[in-house]
């Protein structure tokens, strides 16, 4: 049982969780590439993103103060929510290192926090590989923890590759005046993921514990070509062509996962 920290005044720690979520696809022709980007634009438009972030706010136990959202031309969307912490009971103020809920189970000062999402569809003009990136930031102050939204967000997008960063900044004082630079135990972001999510992804941690900085990279283990080709069935492809497409897609995923080009 985690011991409750008795604070002097408000909890001034800022906890920030950042996601980069990638969906990768193969669209062979120019028409298929345009259709894929149009599909992604519709699937993750500002209205849908607003609903996802509204669910995020509910999961972390906060209230929405203001919403700003925009669909962009030719592609992309963004949503920003200003949120505030409500009164939490001891049971709700939970920073325990454990997974948060899945989707089906559910920019300010001091007690004001924010959540944002921006989308970036793009495609390669020659090799047929298209990617969709969603950047999501959840920043909270006070008792509420952004770590509980991990599972929900990963399952809300077609997440082939995910990079997650969590950091705690500032300090808060206990009743004796001692400064505390983090108010909960954590040794890995992975401990906040459900077992099925952990089993589904290859993961690497790069953590700087003394700086309260945690980083996890995730790449989907299972590869089914039918889930990656757009506008055609993988079974209708020539075996050599199918293998070539799979090689290109796997290379794209590896390059994004390791943040470097593969020669």
From Swiss-Prot:
Site note Cleavage (non-hydrolytic) applies to: 112-113
Q: Which reaction does it catalyse?
A: S-adenosyl-L-methionine + H(+) = S-adenosyl 3-(methylsulfanyl)propylamine + CO2
How does the record describe the protein's post-translational processing? Is synthesized initially as an inactive proenzyme. Formation of the active enzyme involves a self-maturation process in which the active site pyruvoyl group is generated from an internal serine residue via an autocatalytic post-translational modification. Two non-identical subunits are generated from the proenzyme in this reaction, and the pyruvate is formed at the N-terminus of the alpha chain, which is derived from the carboxyl end of the proenzyme.
The free-text cofactor remark is:
Binds 1 pyruvoyl group covalently per subunit.
Which residues catalyse the reaction? Answer: 113, 118, 141
Concerning InterPro entries, the annotation shows:
AdoMetDC_fam_prok, S-AdoMet_deCO2ase_bac, S-AdoMet_deCO2ase_core
Its Gene Ontology cellular component terms are:
cytosol
Keywords, alphabetical? Autocatalytic cleavage, Decarboxylase, Lyase, Polyamine biosynthesis, Pyruvate, S-adenosyl-L-methionine, Schiff base, Spermidine biosynthesis, Zymogen
EC number(s) reported in the record: 4.1.1.50
GO MF term list: adenosylmethionine decarboxylase activity
* Function, in words: Catalyzes the decarboxylation of S-adenosylmethionine to S-adenosylmethioninamine (dcAdoMet), the propylamine donor required for the synthesis of the polyamines spermine and spermidine from the diamine putrescine.
HAMAP family for the chain: AdoMetDC_2 (MF_00465)
Q: How does it assemble?
A: Heterooctamer of four alpha and four beta chains arranged as a tetramer of alpha/beta heterodimers.
Q: What is this protein called?
A: S-adenosylmethionine decarboxylase proenzyme
Organism whose genome encodes this protein: Marinobacter nauticus (strain ATCC 700491 / DSM 11845 / VT8)
Lineage of this protein's species? Bacteria, Pseudomonadati, Pseudomonadota, Gammaproteobacteria, Pseudomonadales
